[in-house]
Structure formats: structure tokens, C-alpha cells
Amino acid sequence: RIAATADPEAAERARVVLVEQADRVAPELGDNPRSLIEDALVQSGVEVRLRETVERVEADNIVLGSGERIASCTLIVTVGPRASPLNEAFGVALDPSGRAPCDDMLRVIGVPDTYMAGDVAMAHVDDEHVALMSCQHAITMGKFAGFNAARDLLGLALRPYRQIRYVTCLDLGRGGAVFTTGWDREVQMHGDEAKQLKRTIVSERIIPPTGEREAILAAAALDG
């Protein structure tokens, strides 16, 4: 990315350090794709500090819990998503990410006549797993919430939200990408092939149609 926005020489001079408080890289993604992620970090020249935390941020460096001082002009902090604080207005117990609990129909539990979808909603995708705060689940949740809200107004039967299929497609920079399936994230594809799939996903598949009415309605189909 530095090479694309500046020049290759600047990219080669840049020092990138990943600080992770866990004892391994990308702990939330499990063991299956980890070797590919680690290889991509090495390929990109990223230094890794495991079991570490940032204790202090100063004008031109950061100080780690171990006392190591890293000279820096840019600090990027990734600490996980947080739901909109508007959820607090519902007066219900929220999950650690600030999401409101929903039943299988995506109705907010304890709040009558209220449907919810996306990052603000905590709902099960199957009998074991809860939806993640990602477009993969938010898009389908939106379809079900809209479907059920409309049918509720008409006094028609509702349909439980279920989204059994789960995939992960992670961009790895120079290392291409890795595509996995299932909650155990079995690797199905990696490298340039997975990179092309990632580009297709972000540029086509998650973009809703804006043209013909028929295309818009087709995209909203629950089984589409």
C-alpha cells in the first residue's frame, strides 16, 4: 500500500511492527489459516511482537509493556468493533460489543414491535454460533428483518433467521489472500486465486443493485 501511494523505495524503507497481546497471530481466526498469515507477514517484512501491549503513545514513538520503545510516525489501533450507542436507548442488557439481543425472528428481546439487523443486533446464525459484526451476516440479517417486519404488519407468518454457510476471505497484501469455509476455517484457496475472489467480493458481491426494480427485489430474496 505504501508502494502504491508513494513509491517502492519508500515502501522498502518503511518499518511496520505488529503488536499482538495474544501468544499467536490472528488468534480469532483459528489454527488452519495461521501459517499462511504468518508467511504473508514475513513476505511483507512485518515485524511481530507477541504477548505485548502498548503502554504509552508519545510524539514520535510508542512504548511497549516490556519497555521496548519503537520510533513511529503512524499508529494504527485495531481493538474490535462496537455497536452504535443508540442501542443503550432500548434499556435492555447489551452484549460486550454493545449489541441488543434478538430472537430468531430478529425482534429485539424485551422491546415490542422492533426488528434489528447488522452490527447492532446479537442473533444466532445457527444453534451454536452468533452472527459476527461483518457485511457477510449484516446483509442477510437485513433481508430477514425487512421480510419479517413487513409480514408482521400484514399479520403473516414470520421466518426464522438462519445463515448456516460461513466463509472468511482475508486479504494478505503481497501474500495474496486466503479463503476458508466453516467456523473452523478450513482453507479452500489461497494466493493469487483467493486475491481475485476477494476483489470480486468487495467490488461486486456485497454491492447492492441500484438499477432495475426486478434486480433490487431479486437481491432481497431470502434464499438469494
Give short role names for the model-derived ranges.
Residues 129, 156-164, 182-189:
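SDR active-site lid
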Residues 61-62, 69-140, 147:
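FAD-site-proximal beta/loop scaffold in flavoenzymes
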Residues 1-52:
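Rossmann-like dinucleotide-binding cores of NAD(P)H-dependent redox enzymes
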Residues 21, 119, 174:
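Cofactor-binding loop segments of dinucleotide-utilizing enzymes, especially the Rossmann-like FAD-
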